[in-house]
Amino acid sequence: MYIRVLEKLTDTALSAHLISIYRDYLPTQGTSLPKVVYIDCKNSFPIRTFHAHLATAPSALSVTSEQIMENVRVVVCLDLTELRKAIQTLSHSLAVERASSKETDPSSTSTTFVILCGLDAMYRATHLVDHLLAHQQLNDSLLRLRILAAEQESGALQTDILLPRAEFPRAASTLLYKEASNSTHPIKKPRSSWYGSGNMLGDYIIKFYTD
């Protein structure tokens, strides 16, 4: 799965999510420690909470917290123009890393996780200036992330977009229905159609860019 839309997480939940990434993608023979690129519209990375979680993480992680922190990069983007530049920089970094690894260890593979927060704020900031530009840059950025993920030589790349549930009401209601259908007290089935005017940001991304 290249791109996922998830409900915005608290600092504690986000830290646990990052820990789970490292737990599930520990370096094995021929792989390197996963890299995390945390992008937000403000410098909100929960470093203290993350450090606290690392201190209590299972020994199965088998790497030090310093090693993990060295592989976490925090990027602040105030609008979609800055996000587009950040993704271009990421693309360049992956290309350089790919060329370097081919020289040192051609069989090695890498995994990069992009955690994208505050996309709704970036979109609004750009939309206030130029609504056409906002739509164009949103599509350019998301398409570029999918292309990078599809390039086998770039290694594995996955993007988690964290948004308030209000930004994907149709997807959220469908998910709630699926969960309720497995319970003893199912709720009334909501509309699950993706069509119609007035798509919210998250529903738009889910419709066109997620797998």
Curated annotation (Swiss-Prot):
<dbReference type="Pfam" id="PF16834">
    <property type="entry name" value="CSM2"/>
</dbReference>
<keyword id="KW-0963">Cytoplasm</keyword>
<comment type="similarity">
    <text>Belongs to the CSM2 family.</text>
</comment>
<keyword id="KW-0539">Nucleus</keyword>
<protein>
    <recommendedName>
        <fullName>Chromosome segregation in meiosis protein 2</fullName>
    </recommendedName>
</protein>
<comment type="function">
    <text>Involved in chromosome segregation during meiosis. Promotes efficient recombinational repair and functions in the protection of the genome from spontaneous and induced DNA damage like mutations and gross chromosomal rearrangements (GCRs).</text>
</comment>
<dbReference type="GO" id="GO:0097196">
    <property type="term" value="C:Shu complex"/>
</dbReference>
<dbReference type="GO" id="GO:0005634">
    <property type="term" value="C:nucleus"/>
</dbReference>
<dbReference type="GO" id="GO:0005737">
    <property type="term" value="C:cytoplasm"/>
</dbReference>
<dbReference type="InterPro" id="IPR027417">
    <property type="entry name" value="P-loop_NTPase"/>
</dbReference>
<keyword id="KW-0469">Meiosis</keyword>
<dbReference type="InterPro" id="IPR031783">
    <property type="entry name" value="Csm2"/>
</dbReference>
<dbReference type="GO" id="GO:0051321">
    <property type="term" value="P:meiotic cell cycle"/>
</dbReference>
<keyword id="KW-0234">DNA repair</keyword>
<keyword id="KW-0227">DNA damage</keyword>
<dbReference type="GO" id="GO:0000725">
    <property type="term" value="P:recombinational repair"/>
</dbReference>
